[in-house]
Amino acid sequence: AVGIVMKAVPVRTTMNILECILIDATTNVIKFTGNDMELGIETIVDGEILEKGKVAIEAKLFSEIVRKLPDSEVTITTDSNYTSLITCENSKINIAGKSGDDFSYLPIIDKDKMITISQFKLKEIINQTIFSTAPNDNNKMMTGELFEVSENTLKVVGLDGHRIAIRNITLEGRADDVKVVVPGKTLQAVSYTHLT
């Protein structure tokens, strides 16, 4: 879960909180979230919540700690100063955290306006069109791809000023018409991430 969320943690930022992973156990599930304000990834992990709460922990350090822990049960306990104790078998690590309230949450998506497409098909579409997006920010619109749904057809268009790639597929079921430009960085992350 941490490795997936790390894809959305920026390498450099002026907002220190974005260098963190949010661990949110305020509901009945444990959510790990990374967000660089352009790409946000949230993943849900199984676990037992003894006391509800949330904390933002420096992502790179947390990722290194988790990677080196044995494949066993991990317990995270956070005090009122957001210092977190990570326990796994004989390992105990204290790490400074920050208030989870300061973390930039992901937008809430209206599930009434969604399309359903297989993970394989989505990755295939991205891989067949992403090469024709612009690599720099001179024109923001060209660094992403147009996703257009019209009459139950999804059209994906990548354009960099010299090349164009278009892919059309028919969607199952009924879908509302919509046009949205998805940043290339986001599409690259989706293409390389195992989704569930």
Kindly give the residue locations of the regions a language model identified.
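Structural preference for solvent-exposed beta-strand-turn elements
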Residues: 1-195
